[in-house]
Amino acid sequence: MKIRQLLISFLLAASTLGATAQVSKTYYVSKPGTLISMMTEEEANSITHLTLTGKLNAEDFRHLRDEFPSLKVLDISNAEIKMYSGKAGTYPNGKFYIYMANFIPAYAFSNVVNGVTKGKQTLEKVILSEKIKNIEDAAFKGCDNLKICQIRKKTAPNLLPEALADSVTAIFIPLGSSDAYRFKNRWEHFAFIEGEPLETTIQVGAMGKLEDEIMKAGLQPRDINFLTIEGKLDNADFKLIRDYMPNLVSLDISKTNATTIPDFTFAQKKYLLKIKLPHNLKTIGQRVFSNCGRLAGTLELPASVTAIEFGAFMGCDNLRLSLIHISE
């Protein structure tokens, strides 16, 4: 019986690994509206990372939205978006619509189903061209996992209502272009980070060794935007996060042994949008998240939490707290 259970566990693990495997493809689209004809349904279903060059239109975006169920990363930074008019674009219910050239179409990655707007939940990162002029209405509305929108353009494109959510998506832009974006209408509340987004997972085998592990990976703490830490953390490690990681957008420390987050650890982290807390956390120190104004949505507090010290969430006006039970 034990052998059979082990075999079943192995097969389940293998199937899970296969389901999450990265499948990267690059296509040159010579004629707008023909993307889907360049691959089989099976290929479209398997792609997680897609790079497109050439010419696209609203028909192609509709297919990207509706027929690529595993799509996580889309790079259209070297593609040109052509004008299209008709009923086969992205607008809900097949409405006739005129889609302008180099505009990310309205409802590009969202759709209205039974009166409710639903975004593409698999989409995590999109890279847009320097030619982009507009990001149209509801283009990425409801894309709750779109953590990165990287725009190659040095001046901000026009952002239309509900096109992007500032509580979900960090905007990565060319060096020296922050002011051009920050003062543009509807861009004011987004987190802008200049340069390339950097994501990493660090495993820490001994207390106080986070810095060593980051250096071993050939990284600098200040450059990290999306960080997952697994293993052991102590106060020295939290001090490193506090003092030398100003550009954190997302942090997952759920699989660490930490039971206390020291005072002021994440205070004034102006780009921080999301955090996952340690499963066995007991104490959140004074002003730990003070003035993390972009931290939004629901923060899940493990049931093990017994103390939240003064001002821990001061200035986190967009944050909701939720007590959860985590099964070991």
What are these regions (language model features)?
Residues 1-24:
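Bacterial Sec-dependent N-terminal signal peptides
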Residues 39-47, 67-68, 164-166, 216-224, ...:
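Flexible, charged surface loops at secondary-structure boundaries
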Residues 60-67, 138-139, 237-241:
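A short acidic, amphipathic alpha-helical/loop segment
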